[in-house]
Amino acid sequence: MHQVVSATTNPAKIQAILRAFEEIFGEGSCHIEAVAVESGVPEQPFGSEETRAGARNRVLNAKALRSDADFWVAIEAGIDDGATFSWVVIENREQRGEARSATLPLPAIILEKVRAGEALGPVMSQYTGIDEIGRKEGAIGVFTAGALTRSSVYHQAVILALSPFHNAIYR
């Protein structure tokens, strides 16, 4: 059984990680331990590079905290060019896999508040009246009318980031 450390305690992210690992490695193939670690970037990262740096830093910090795991996984959400997205970083002892998620354009009224310094999650909670929406369906669930959720979009990115770990051609 794979010991997987999730560098987040966010339920939407943990669900995405668990589903992806089970799809790739089989049901019941992993145990996930969630840890709270720092990203080393602002609460609301801007730009692809800052967001990816946050995910990489979370993996590094999770490895320092739980060095005996088989995999360390981080999902860092950010804002880039008027849209929200995330970077997924997965490492084991030999290699790293990274993938950027799908991108959701944000309405101007939401972007205005985020650019003024508020994090997207609290802004969306104010807009929708849903407490801690970032730990649930997220802006993605709201603006896709539930066709996608934050977790489902992260799930795809985790699957992509796992590609180097089960395809020999990457080694």
From Swiss-Prot:
Reactions that this protein is recorded to catalyse: XTP + H2O = XDP + phosphate + H(+); ITP + H2O = IDP + phosphate + H(+)
Pfam families to which the protein is assigned, alphabetical: NTPase_I-T (PF01931)
Chain residues that bind substrate: T8, T9, N10, P11, A12, K13, D68, A69
Enzyme Commission number, as recorded: 3.6.1.73
GO BP term, example: nucleotide metabolic process
Entry binding sites for Mg(2+): E38, D68
Residue stretches spanning the membrane: none
Keyword Magnesium: yes
Entry keyword set: Hydrolase, Magnesium, Manganese, Metal-binding, Nucleotide metabolism, Nucleotide-binding
Cofactor: Mg(2+); Mn(2+)
Record-given protein name: Inosine/xanthosine triphosphatase
Species this chain originates from: Enterobacter sp. (strain 638)
